[in-house]
Amino acid sequence: MAIYDFGNIEKKWQERWQENKAFSIIERDRPKYYVLEMFPYPSGKIHMGHVRNYSIGDVVARFKRMKGYNVLHPMGWDSFGLPAENAAIKHGIHPDHWTKENVKEMKEQLDALGLSYDWDREVSTCTPEYYKWTQWLFLQFYHKGLAYKKESQVNWCPSCETVLANEQVVNGGCDRCDSSVGKKNLNQWYFKITDYAEALLEDIKLLDGWPEKVKTMQQNWIGKSHGAEIDFPIENTSKELKVFTTRPDTIYGATYMVLAPEHPYVMELVKETEYEEAVVAFRNKLQHMSDIERTSTEIEKEGIFIGKYCINPVSNEKIPIYIANYVLADYGTGAIMAVPAHDQRDLDFARKYDITVTPVIRPIDESDGFDIEKEAYTDSGIMINSEKFNGLDSEKAYEDIAKHIETLNAGKRTINYRLRDWLLSRQRYWGTPIPIIYCDDCGIVPVREEELPVKLPVDVTFSGKGSSPLETSEGFLNTNCPSCGKMAKRETDTMDTFVDSSWYFLRYTDANNEQLPFSKEAANYWVPVDQYIGGVEHAILHLLYSRFFTKVMKDLGLTDQPEPFKKLLTQGMVLKDGAKMSKSKGNVVSPEEIIQKYGADTARLFVLFAAPPERDLEWSDQGVEGSYRFLNRVWRLAEEFIDNNLFMSTSLGEALTKRDKDLKYTIHYTIKKVTSDVEDRFNFNTAISAVMELINELYKYKETDPSKLNGDLFREGIETSILLLAPFAPHFTEELWEKLGKAESVHMTNWPEYDHEAIIKDEVEIVMQVNGKVKDRMMVPTNVSKEELESLAMKNEKIIQIIEGKQIIKIIAVPKKLVNIVIK
């Protein structure tokens, strides 16, 4: 008997798949199925999270092929990003070389897992062949008015003299040199995603195949709220402070105004006043805090009075203007109408700085003991201290006061969104160059489409200091204006890498198109992606940006599809010792070591069997050993079957014994269960468990009475087990399938169909209970009636002994399940 030599088997089949381009065949006469895992950043090494993510997608792809679908299952590389640039600074390795070496290494590791990718469609976002079309799409956005430039704040390291991304700011310091990070105003490029806020929100209802958690996160991120925009005139100036509030009914209780310290009016209002020095110091203090820190519920709310007042437009009362650490300039209008009686944060601030608190809503039932001295009242109620609106229900007063504000020309009812425009400028080298030219005469001029791609230059200096490395390349920086022909300068910012990943799934549909990013025909055929798989950490940015891009491209006429992903699976993390695997924790398990010791199929089987895909998976060495033992058990059974010609024993043409029928039932019940588990629920763990039970039954069947073994039935059991395991353990099953004399690949073989008649049992086990406690079990005909079941129960010897001399209250009979006799 041949041993399970996984090393040679896996190498053999990987080479054969590659030679035959086994997964590149496209057959348009079949229904399409597009399965996609989020493409990785090429760090150089895959980790167990990758193994799990890609194994899940591969099971789906292989299953759908066997079910007769025309499957698209591509892979590529999200290959722009900071690590490559940091490697250039630290080790003097050019990002392009560093990235290509990592891609090569990771591709070999993915192939070693036996993943069924169509490598003919491979994309890498850092290649000119790809980023040409990213630039082309930017130009389409620009011409549509969706790409624009404005001044905004960025993180600035004074030591490195460079801009830092948010993820490079660690505890207020630079991740390179630990210097305190400040803020700096720069002109930056944005995408106008807010133009699509309503469409992005409204179409969440189309995402039936997405987890509710992810849909809720997107809804909250977009953050639609109804309210009023109100203008508060600043005393003794011609300026007004514009605020948005969801509670116009509380405007009479507004006793102070809070501005973000970075609000454009602040420095102008305090200029050459006694408050200027304190305001500057306060602003400088906040320079070293992230937006997340400033808005945290844990942080103490701090502020200072700036010496100015504004006028409440409905009461004409003067209210003081403060700046505070918890108000952000780019959220809302950067100004808040503070109503301390009805907002706990405002109340805490008012108490700290001794600001007036004016309740304008009281509880409907005044006997409920509510005390404004203890907490803010945030519910609806009866209006008070609100002039002509006193006595009204606050919910009705909401509309009345909003109308009153409009009558006074002091504001309007409106809808606000939490969503902000997408800042895409990065002062980096290793990203897609923004295809814009600056001319002293013509201003901002887009690069002509025929001149794309604007390629990244090689002659740059990676010092880690100053502005973008692109500014160090004279050949890149200096160019001619496309409009007037005079000398001009190129944009030296590159795009946020989320831009690259917002449309890659469309490029896969037509990856080698040199005329367009993709043809409309290909996009409409393949998109939406039928099943998208990736981590929940991408629930907002990547998924929202991809939805935005798809909607814009629909409006541009590039595709007819409004949404990119039909179904979404967010897989859980791989843990060890209860924590996410990381080098710092010393709990990393290397996929390469597992593959070398047990084989790729064992690694795949374990990560698919150990937990449902959407849950976290706890690594277990014993679990890996168990998966390896199971594959060896299947191997021995199949080898024994082949070596001993067991299938020659008898024929299915002969009458089946009860033992035969039981095995046939198990075979076809397993087909039904595995099909349902994989197709409908992605319950891969229970699917594998069902195959394990079938293997147990085949062993029992073989060993009980070998002389009366039905060879054809046993062969059916062996072949079914191999087919059902094929998506999970692809090399293993290919080898056994070939050993069984099959000419066609197991992965191109039709998925087995279960026989409805075979899973109808002649007999069923009934549980016998007395007063709800199990006393016996018995086999009865499947079609026995309720009355017959009661009669059989009353004739059961154990039951007769228990109920003798007792009063029978009632008999509960449930056909095919149980009989419960209630006595006293």
From Swiss-Prot:
GO terms for molecular function: aminoacyl-tRNA deacylase activity; ATP binding; leucine-tRNA ligase activity. A motif ('HIGH' region) lies at residues 40-50. Disulfide bonds: none annotated. It comes from the Bacteria. One of its GO terms (cellular component) is cytosol. Signal peptide: none annotated. Keywords: Aminoacyl-tRNA synthetase, ATP-binding, Cytoplasm, Ligase, Nucleotide-binding, Protein biosynthesis. Its EC number is 6.1.1.4. InterPro entries: aa-tRNA-synth_I_CS (IPR001412), aa-tRNA-synth_Ia (IPR002300), Leu-tRNA-ligase (IPR002302), Leu_tRNA-synth_edit (IPR025709), M/V/L/I-tRNA-synth_anticd-bd (IPR013155), Methionyl/Leucyl_tRNA_Synth (IPR015413), Rossmann-like_a/b/a_fold (IPR014729), tRNAsynth_Ia_anticodon-bd (IPR009080). It is found in: Cytoplasm. One of its GO terms (biological process) is leucyl-tRNA aminoacylation. The keyword Cytoplasm applies. It catalyses: tRNA(Leu) + L-leucine + ATP = L-leucyl-tRNA(Leu) + AMP + diphosphate. Pfam families: Anticodon_1, tRNA-synt_1, tRNA-synt_1_2, tRNA-synt_1g. The keyword Transmembrane does not apply. HAMAP family: Leu_tRNA_synth_B. This is Leucine--tRNA ligase. It comes from Alkaliphilus metalliredigens (strain QYMF). The gene is leuS.
